[in-house]
C-alpha cells in the first residue's frame, strides 16, 4: 500500500541503497498521492504497476501497467487503470443508473472471479452483490478511454454546504507541502454548513508549519469550497495493519454525541 512506499522512502538508508535488482513494485489498497508516486519512481528506478480490486472481486480487477506510468499522458498517474479482460466496470448514481464518462458515481465491478457471497451473512451479501455486480463503496469516474479514476471511499466523502468533497483530492495536494509527512482529511460537524473540512497533519521531523500555511497551500489549486477550514497537528495517524489510514477513528472525537457521522 502507498503508506509502505512512503515508509521505505523515509528510511534514512534509502538514498544509499542499491535498488538495481528491483524489477517491479506492485501497489494498491488505497489512493496514492501523485507526488509520492513520482518520488517513488525516481527513488527506486523500477517499473510500477497499480492493482485495484476487492477481496469480493477476486482481488485483481483493474490494472495500471508499467507503460502507463511512463506515458506522455501524465494524467494516467492519477488513474487506477483499465479493467482486466473479463472484468466489467460501471459507474452509477445513487439510483443505480449508469453515468457517462467524467461523472463521479459509485464503482461497480463484475468479475468471473467474484465471490458467491459472505459466509452466513445473507443481508450483507444482498447489499454488496446485486445482479452479479459488486458494489465497491468507492467513488470514482472513467474517462473516454476506459481508464478508472478513484476519488475516495463514499463513506469518507464530505458534504460541505451541499457540495460533495472527496478527501483524497485534498490530501493529494497537501502531500506536496514540503513540511507534511502524513495527512488525513475528514468532515467534522458544522452547524451552518453541515460538515466542515479538517486536515489532520503529521509534520516531518524538524519541520514547522502553521494552520494558515496549510490552508493557503491548497488555495488556488482547488475550488474554494474544497479548502480545509481547520487544521490539527498530531504525532501519528491511526492505521490498519496494512497501513491504511483509519478515517473512522480520526472522526470519532468530533462526532461524539451524534447519531451518525454525517450532519
Please report, for each region that a protein language model flagged, where it lies by residue:
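Conserved beta-loop-beta connector loops within the AMP-binding
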Residues: 88-108, 144-145, 207-211, 246
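Acidic/polar alpha-helix N-cap and adjacent early helical turns
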Residues: 252-263
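Active-site glycine-centered loops adjacent to acidic/histidine catalytic or metal-binding residues
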Residues: 29, 53, 81, 138, ...
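Alpha-helix capping/helix-boundary segments
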Residues: 4-5, 32, 114
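Glycine-centered tight turns that cap/initiate beta-strands
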Residues: 13, 21, 45, 86, ...
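AMP-binding/adenylate-forming catalytic core of the ANL superfamily
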Residues: 1, 111-117, 127, 139-226, ...
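Gly/Ser/Thr-rich phosphate-binding loop
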Residues: 9-75, 88, 95-98
Amino acid at each position: 500500500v502507498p503508506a509502505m512506499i512512503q515508509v521505505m522512502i523515509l528510511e534514512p538508508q534509502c538514498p544509499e541503497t542499491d535498488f538495481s535488482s528491483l524489477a517491479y513494485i506492485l501497489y494498491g489498497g488505497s489512493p496514492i498521492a501523485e507526488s509520492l508516486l513520482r518520488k517513488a519512481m525516481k527513488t527506486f528506478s523500477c517499473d510500477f504497476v497499480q492493482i485495484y480490486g476487492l477481496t469480493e472481486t477476486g482481488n485483481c480487477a483493474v490494472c495500471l501497467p508499467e507503460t502507463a506510468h511512463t506515458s506522455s499522458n501524465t494524467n494516467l498517474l492519477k488513474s487506477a487503470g483499465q479493467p482486466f479482460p473479463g472484468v466489467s466496470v460501471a459507474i452509477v448514481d445513487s439510483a443505480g443508473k449508469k453515468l457517462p464518462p467524467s461523472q463521479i458515481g459509485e464503482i461497480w465491478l463484475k468479475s468471473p472471479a467474484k465471490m458467491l457471497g459472505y459466509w452466513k451473512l445473507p443481508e450483507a451479501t444482498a447489499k454488496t452483490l446485486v445482479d452479479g455486480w459488486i458494489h465497491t463503496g468507492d467513488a470514482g469516474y472513467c474517462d473516454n478511454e476506459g481508464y478508472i479514476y478513484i476519488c475516495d471511499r463514499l463513506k469518507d466523502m464530505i458534504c460541505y454546504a451541499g457540495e460533495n468533497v472527496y478527501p483524497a483530492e485534498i490530501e493529494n495536494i497537501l502531500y506536496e507541502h514540503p513540511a507534511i509527512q502524513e495527512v488525513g482529511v475528514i468532515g467534522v460537524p458544522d452547524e451552518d454548513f453541515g460538515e466542515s473540512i479538517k486536515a489532520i497533519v503529521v509534520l516531518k521531523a524538524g519541520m514547522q508549519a502553521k494552520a494558515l500555511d496549510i490552508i493557503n497551500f491548497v488555495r488556488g489549486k482547488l475550488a474554494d469550497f474544497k479548502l480545509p477550514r481547520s487544521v490539527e497537528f498530531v504525532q501519528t495517524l491511526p492505521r490498519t495493519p496494512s497501513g491504511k489510514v483509519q478515517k473512522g477513528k480520526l472522526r470519532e472525537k468530533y462526532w461524539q454525541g451524534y447519531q451518525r457521522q454525517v450532519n
